[in-house]
Amino acid sequence: MTKTSDFDDKVNYSATGYSRLAKSLIDIVKEQQAKLGYRKEIVRLYYPLSTLRHFFECAGTDNKIAAGVISEQQMLEILAPNNLPKQLTDSIGEIKVTAKNERFCIEIPPKGSEYVYENTADNEFISELIALVGTHGCTMEQITELFYKYSDDIEKKEMQNGEFDCYIRFLNDPDDTYYYCFHDEGCHIIYHRFLPQDYADFGF
């Protein structure tokens, strides 16, 4: 199948919404593999339309996306097989995308799981974080120390929204811009991480 949206060079592709989407998919698959181990199998990930809009609406004219809010149908067209660039399909494969009520299911083929496992560097921080929060008696002090192990330049702020107690993020790591939000449930601590635009949308 000939791709109609191939980009001429790596720099051009890296500035696109497709590249942002691919990074997000790979990050989540790596996190899942750190939690559950690697299996060469189909992975289904779910995104709200708002998150996908952030990937593409800030991606510039090289994606040929008109100004304005991208609808569910427009997003399905953007992610249609004949519009996926070769740079994306060569790594995580021919993804399949469906949507209902602005909730998108992105199906990554076994090739994608294998690619992430064999061709991307281990995320030691995520592996250590998952192991730490899975330890009985884990404390926020220990979690904060783990962040400092990887960078002296972090931000930690208390949250009072009823869902999370605080967030921690790396301030100068372009590869990890997530807000890591933590909640102490008494017997253990849970976390969720959000991209900056999604964090802003939630109004935490």
What are the residue ranges of the model-derived segments?
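Charged low-complexity interaction tracts in eukaryotic proteins
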Residues: 4-11, 16, 81-120, 164, ...
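Positively charged, polyanion-binding regions of nucleic-acid-associated proteins
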Residues: 6-45, 55
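Alpha-helix boundary/N-cap detector
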Residues: 9-24, 47, 70, 120, ...
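Short glycine-rich, basic-tinged beta-strand/loop micro-motifs
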Residues: 37-60, 125-133
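Charge-enriched amphipathic alpha-helical scaffolds
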Residues: 43, 53-94
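Phospho-regulated, low-complexity intrinsically disordered regions of nuclear gene-regulatory
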Residues: 96-128, 175-204
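Short helix/turn-capping signatures at newly exposed starts of structured segments
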Residues: 125-153
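A cross-family detector of function-defining hotspots
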Residues: 145-179
